């Protein structure tokens, strides 16, 4: 991702209460950086559908991929994790798990970062790039809970999101569509995107810009190994 938590803090500025959504928090490394960058006025909501990630961010004694303790994610009252996928409806959805061939934990300890509610397409083999990540495979699906940002915010009495961070592996359309009511109350949105079909029928940057018609694209960090990047959008204030 192309932006740091300290830069996000500068963007948000001084506020009495700060709400950040991290959609696709993986093993919690970025989540811990958010907690250590912001003060007591932060409320951090994180989401991830991958079962291994959910275990690692909710179990005392667990570690992230680099051996850092995850205990802060459990003990810090500013953090709330929800084991689910965010999409455009509330219920259940099929999640395509990723793993690394010959990795520990049947490969899920290393390769769990590319799973998606969408089926991988050019991720596994691209006409342009070939097999970029041959050790990464998608061989298992699991049914997981899902909800929308709108439903989650209504249930948890959240009326504003200062920063929406999305690392959703091709599910950008679904996440943003599920936030139709809340979009007017979100200050910044930071999302990855793909202009190749990395995942089946995933939204490219042009479609994301159409969905976020009331936002300005302020930054676009392009990837070197894929047709895509990370984009930062700022709410247009009349």
Label each residue range with its predicted role:
Residues 1-238:
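Phosphate/nucleotide-binding beta-alpha loop and adjacent structural elements of enzyme active sites
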